[in-house]
UniProtKB/Swiss-Prot annotation:
Key words of the record: Amidation, Cleavage on pair of basic residues, Neuropeptide, Repeat, Secreted
Propeptide: 1-68, 75-150, 166-195, 212-217, 226-233, 249-257, 265-271, 280-286, 295-301, 310-316, 325-331, 340-346, 355-361, 370-376, 385-391, 400-407, 416-423, 432-439, 448-455, 464-471, 480-487, 496-503, 512-519, 528-535, 544-551, 567-597
The protein's name: FMRF-amide neuropeptides
Source organism (scientific name): Aplysia californica (California sea hare)
Segments of this protein annotated with the region Disordered: 98-141, 569-597
Keyword Repeat (UniProt): yes
Compartment(s): Secreted
Amino acid sequence: MRPWCQLALLACLSLKWLTSHVTAESFLCDDSELCENGYLRFGRSMSVEEPHFRLERRSYPPVVYHKRFLRFGRSQEPDIEDYARAIALIESEEPLYRKRRSADADGQSEKVLHRARREAESEHKSLEEVSPDTKQDVEKRDADDVLDAEKRFMRFGKRFMRFGRGSSDDDESGDDDVQDLTDIGDGLGGEGEVNKRFMRFGKRFMRFGKREDGEPDKRFMRFGKSMADNDLDKRFMRFGKRFMRFGKSLPDSEVDKRFMRFGKSVDGDVDKRFMRFGKSVDGDVDKRFMRFGKSVDGDVDKRFMRFGKSVDGDVDKRFMRFGKSVDGDVDKRFMRFGKSVDDDVDKRFMRFGKSVDGDVDKRFMRFGKSVDDAVDKRFMRFGKSVDSDLDKRFMRFGKSVGSDEVDKRFMRFGKSVGSDEVDKRFMRFGKSLGTDDVNKRFMRFGKSLGTDDVNKRFMRFGKSLGTEDVDKRFMRFGKSLGTDDVDKRFMRFGKSLGTDDVDKRFMRFGKSLGTEDVDKRFMRFGKSLGTDDVDKRFMRFGKSLGTEDVDKRFMRFGKRFMRFGRSVGDSKYRSASSESVMTTDSKQTTEQATNKS
């Protein structure tokens, strides 16, 4: 019996080995050339010697990796581009290594050189003016940019998604053939440093069209043609100056900055109207914007977005009026729906449903029905209540357990365990361990380690290091440095400087100035003025006025936010006075409605 058991065990092991071998062979590509191209890799590239996936658990050999992410372009197969790149690297690395003294000094000086280059570029100065000591070293280290530039394409932290082709300005240098094979882009003045743009966060990006001069080539999403002036060629869908131009201009090119112009004017001087509709009664007040309907008196013809008709000509300054009134004095209603029971409370706004008592008819956005008339002032109520006194719930979903004090839940999902104090959960997902104190989870994903105190995770992704205190990660991406305290990263992209405290970056794009404290930028666009404190801009568009305090604008369109056009002479004062009059009337109307409510 014993030899038979050993033979059966040997047969099972043989079958297991054969099955594993067949399964491993099924994952390999049939085309060997396709496997050698280095595709199907994430995070870092495979080596040429081992181009396939490794199923066994072991680390990669210490070979040179490019760490490209979502790489598009050349493969591992050598071609003429590789030979040209090798020639460029040999010519650039020989003087570079003669100047190097030690590995430590090289790493420190490289940060200083990169910082000096960025400061000179942002301040539009020469490198010798910013840092005279590092000018010669930067010229010797231009080969590093060529080497690092080859690792871009959809890479968080440096340049990526580069498209386009070089212009005629780049063809004046002697090594054009080598440079065109390694760098594809459009440079300004032959500078190889700015040759890496196009879809690049941190400098110029999304460039379309052609330029007339090398200086104003920083156009973004340019459409149409200019008025034969190179300085005016920066408009068309450009954040910071003119954009979205419609209509035709006057013979003077100075008034060509109109945006979204419609209709016709009465006087040629006031032809800068934007989004004008309807007709005016007096030529002086023809600067209305978005005017609808007609007026009763010519003095109040400055109405904007007027609907319906009025009872008295004095109160004809209504905006967005719907329905009809009961008394002429309360005709200043805005967005009125439904009907009222009492004339005094006819200033309701956005009323739905019906009331039980005329005194509580001032409800706004009421849904459902009430049990008691005194609590009929509910807003956006859903479902039914248990007690009339608790009927003031807002946006209630689900049902309660039966206790009166826990019936004030808002946006409740799921079911409770049975205790009244835990029934106040909001937006609960998943299941609990069966204890009452951990049933208050909100938007929980993933699984816990089995202990009750770590079951309160919210939106957890990834895996923990095995300790209970780090299992509370929220929306974690990427990998940690191996320490427990830095494993709580949220939405981390790119790479860190090597220190634990800067590894907690969130959605970082672009590049830093070389200091660790400015490496925590979030969604940075555009370029800074060269100072460290203004490098933390978020979603910046356009350019500043030259002062550092205005360079921290967020979602800036022009100087003001959503600015269309500019005033001419004293027209802005007349517009401002008319707007102030309308604002005062609107405020008085709102205050009257609020007091009566």
